[in-house]
UniProtKB/Swiss-Prot annotation:
Keyword check for Metal-binding: yes
Enzyme class: transferase
Reactions catalysed according to its record: [HPr protein]-L-serine + ATP = [HPr protein]-O-phospho-L-serine + ADP + H(+); [HPr protein]-O-phospho-L-serine + phosphate + H(+) = [HPr protein]-L-serine + diphosphate
Keyword list, A-Z: ATP-binding, Kinase, Magnesium, Metal-binding, Multifunctional enzyme, Nucleotide-binding, Serine/threonine-protein kinase, Transferase
Cofactor dependence: Mg(2+)
Organism listed in the record: Neisseria meningitidis serogroup A / serotype 4A (strain DSM 15465 / Z2491)
Region of interest (Important for the catalytic mechanism of dephosphorylation), ranges: 269-274
Region Important for the catalytic mechanism of both phosphorylation and dephosphorylation: start-end pairs: 204-213
Protein name: HPr kinase/phosphorylase
Gene assigned in the entry: hprK
Length: 320
């Protein structure tokens, strides 16, 4: 199961969430991870002793209860209620940290952070952050591009010209996200987000030219950090026999399953004389039209059927 350390969570959100260490620095390497029986959204919540969250957030009501607990009004002690398996405690709303909570976290190596932000907002941001960071992931070989604001993954065997095609599309104003190893994350039930590893960011390998820094050559707008994957274009090597067998009026919608998410796919034959960059742009434009409920193939077939019916009626009404 994917997990992250408290240290990384703190580093990634320190300024946005106004986080500060209060105690338990020795537990900075505690792991926060997805459990088999709990979704990511259940990792964060207000202080709960019955079903403890991995990240326990102390708000106004929880702080008041802890003060009563420390004064002995409840008849319980911290050790009776707290689960030492929790990964992190955050005191929100700019509230002071009670000495009892500070000592308990220090003794049990539980990181204790404070934040000036209100607890509901704090939890919302952390849930979104964890949902993206701990998302199920996969790596696909190909080139991931932003074409007409649509995330397009170009796949195919080595040597078919994926990088050259990507370079042509970038020169036409589209943007590169990742080359060679595209990292895909399922950030929602039906949503895949494609990213590039930090090591490969900005680079595109083109045979004969070597490794190119696309940002330096084409400018800042030629690079995107991430994009939702919406369309897969698979390049296949095509000979004369393949082209003869190709269904030229296919109305079947092809999809490819990645991390249990079905993504629309299009197969483009690679042959001498075919302008692949124009074909990719046309495929993306056609996909956008289909999202709007317009299907050119079905429209043509309907028009064809209408014409056939009109011809039949004309022949029936014609005198012998």
């Amino acid at each position: 199961m994917p997990s992250i350390s408290v240290r990384r969570l703190f580093d990634d959100n320190q300024y946005k969430l106004q986080l500060a260490w209060a105690a338990g620095n020795s537990g900075a390497d505690n792991r926060i991870g997805v459990e088999a029986d709990k979704p990511v959204l259940a990792l964060v919540g207000h202080l709960n002793f019955i079903h403890p969250n991995q990240i326990q957030v102390v708000g106004l009501a929880e702080s008041e209860y802890l003060n009563r607990l420390e004064s002995g009004e409840t008849g319980y002690q911290f050790g009776d209620l707290f689960d030492i398996s929790m990964s992190l405690v955050i005191v929100a709303n700019g509230l002071p940290v009670s000495p009892g909570l500070r000592d308990y976290c220090h003794k049990n190596d539980i990181p204790l952070l404070t934040s000036k932000l209100e607890s509901p907002y704090l939890m919302d941001v952390l849930r979104i952050y964890l949902q993206r960071t701990l998302a199920a992931s996969s790596v696909k070989h190909g080139v991931f591009l932003d074409v007409f604001e649509i995330g397009v993954l170009i796949t195919g065997h080595s040597g078919l010209g994926k990088s050259e095609l990507a370079l042509e599309l970038i020169s036409r104003g589209h943007s590169l996200i990742a080359d060679d190893a595209v990292e895909l994350f399922r950030i929602g039930p039906e949503t895949l987000e494609g990213r590039c590893s930090p090591m490969l960011r900005d680079f595109l390998e083109v045979r004969g030219l070597g490794i190119l820094n696309i940002r330096h050559i084409f400018g800042e707008t030629s690079i995107r950090p991430k994009k939702i994957l919406q369309l897969i274009i698979n390049l296949v090597e095509a000979d004369d026999e393949y082209m003869k067998q190709l269904d030229r009026l296919s109305i079947r919608t092809e999809t490819e399953s990645i991390l249990n998410v079905n993504v629309r796919s299009v197969t483009l034959p690679v042959a001498v004389g075919r302008n692949l960059a124009v074909l990719v742009e046309a495929a993306v434009r056609n996909y956008i039209l289909q999202l709007r409920g317009k299907d050119s193939t079905r429209e043509f077939l309907e028009r064809h059927q209408t014409q056939l019916k009109e011809n039949e009626q004309h022949n029936e009404n014609r005198p012998d």
